[in-house]
């Protein structure tokens, strides 16, 4: 785990802020991954829970997740733009007036954090990994994912899917029990 985190941090520093195209590519790969593995996902959820309806699982785990990933893909360009703000609204009136006369300008520049840790709960094991992943990738971050140990079949499939679609420098899945989760959250 620590080696993966070091690698992701190193590459974040070396490669700087990811482009719009790379962010959209990562989101596209998530969508393609869901489309390719949708039957296996539902089978694993059935194995883990034993009583999930395939239709409701398809709606909650696959379709709603594709919807949130598509939403992120459609809006990532807008979310990346710098946001202009009025200058010095918190300053006293004379200073605010002087600063505006001098032509000061303010903006918010959105930048990625680097590597984000994502610990998923057991109840919606695919949706609660990939829906937040949409905003994580849209923001330009890399991710380390710890799926729930209470859904072992789905966690193993999640690891397999991510190994196929992503390099560990972009997204890594760490499986294991409570001891792994404790070590993961302490990174």
Q: Residues of each region from the PLM?
A:
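Rossmann-like NAD(P) dinucleotide-binding subdomain of oxidoreductase/dehydrogenase enzymes
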Residues: 81, 90-187
């Amino acid at each position: 785990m620590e080696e993966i985190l070091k690698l992701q941090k190193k590459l974040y520093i070396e490669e700087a802020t990811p482009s719009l195209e790379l962010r959209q590519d990562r989101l596209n790969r998530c969508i393609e991954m869901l489309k390719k593995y949708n039957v296996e996902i539902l089978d694993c959820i059935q194995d883990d829970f034993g009583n999930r309806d395939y239709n409701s699982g398809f709606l909650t785990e696959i379709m709603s997740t594709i919807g949130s990933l598509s939403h992120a893909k459609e809006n990532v360009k807008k979310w990346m733009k710098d946001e202009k703000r009025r200058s010095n609204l918190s300053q006293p009136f004379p200073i605010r007036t002087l600063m505006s006369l001098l032509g000061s300008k303010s903006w918010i520049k959105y930048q990625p954090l680097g590597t984000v840790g994502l610990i998923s709960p057991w109840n919606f094991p695919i949706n609660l990994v990939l829906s937040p992943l949409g905003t994580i990738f849209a923001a330009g971050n890399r991710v380390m994912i710890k799926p729930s140990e209470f859904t072992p079949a789905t966690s193993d499939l999640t690891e397999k899917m991510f190994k196929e679609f992503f390099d560990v420098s972009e997204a890594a899945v760490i499986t294991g029990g409570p001891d792994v989760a404790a070590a993961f959250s302490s990174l």
